[in-house]
A protein has these predicted regions:
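Noncatalytic, beta-rich nucleic-acid-contacting surfaces in large DNA/RNA-processing enzymes
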Residues: 1-172
Length: 172
């Protein structure tokens, strides 16, 4: 019993004194339940989605119930002034949430729904070799599918990457 109390005190200490680190650890452990398309929005949008799910609580799957728990924690985190930075092609980790600063946490690639751990790791491995010059280069070097490219595009990860490796005469 002493071990459980000691662990609870440690967790509580981190939640109060190092909240960004606490939330990073919590979300990383439960990354399979995290959905960046929902949780990366505004506090009002997350609350609205939470209320929708609460109203249909009889029809929820276990994954939806787990997502609701994460939603509660994200809302709490946002109320404490800590925000989620979007997935970034050059800064995000494959599976771990990262503390950017005391008030910002960056989401990993696998926070995007449908982007698995293997695909996320292949993106990280490829970007460590050299920067991506285009979406075509990203796809060729990582071997990820067109649907995952679309997922990255929807998540805002591709920024200003051109579609093709070829440059045009007027692109300068």
């Amino acid at each position: 019993a002493v071990a459980y109390v000691t662990m609870a005190l440690r967790i509580a200490w981190y939640k109060v004194h190092r909240p960004a680190a606490y939330y990073c650890a919590y979300y990383t452990v439960r990354a399979d339940c995290f959905d960046a398309s929902i949780l990366g929005g505004t506090q009002e949008a997350i609350r609205g989605r939470y209320k929708e799910m609460e109203e249909n609580s009889k029809d929820l799957t276990q994954k939806d119930k787990d997502l609701m728990i994460i939603m509660e924690l994200v809302i709490e985190m946002l109320c404490r002034g800590i925000k989620l930075a979007p997935v970034d092609l050059y800064k995000s980790d494959a599976t771990k949430f990262q503390v950017v600063d005391e008030k910002t946490i960056r989401m990993p690639f696998n926070a995007l729904p449908g982007l698995g751990e293997a695909a996320a790791q292949s993106i990280v491995d490829a970007r460590e070799q050299s920067p991506f010059i285009s979406i075509e280069d990203l796809r060729n070097r990582t071997k990820i599918s067109a649907s995952l490219i679309d997922l990255l595009r929807e998540g805002g990860c591709l920024g200003g990457l051109p579609e093709s490796n070829q440059t045009t005469l007027f692109s300068f």
